Amino acid sequence: TLKAITTVYRIIAMASKDLHLNLKGEYFHAIRAGKKVEEYRLYNNYWRKRLEGREYERLIIKWGYPAGHEAHRIINLPYFGYEVKTITHPLFGPDPVKVFAIKCDVNWMLRGEK
């Protein structure tokens, strides 16, 4: 049944050690160029469930939803965690919001991160 398939998919996804983020091109290219070192997600139950208390090995950043042959639309980084911050950003409206700031520095080796 569809419910059983969905349950199996969720179990497999939970066992995954990779955090996947799909981004708009503007943000993907800024990360790839090293100009953007954090990707923001609203601090809400959806993202709390996916980030808090979880240990990931890799951060997979994708420009949209790339097809199998579009490797140039994927950035594969070690996962360095996140910080909870309050920011103001046009994407979230005019008021300050609480976010998960997921670390995504492509130049991490140059900065001596482990």
Named regions from a protein language model:
Residues 1-13:
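Short, Lys/Arg-enriched N-terminal segments with co-localized hydrophobic residues
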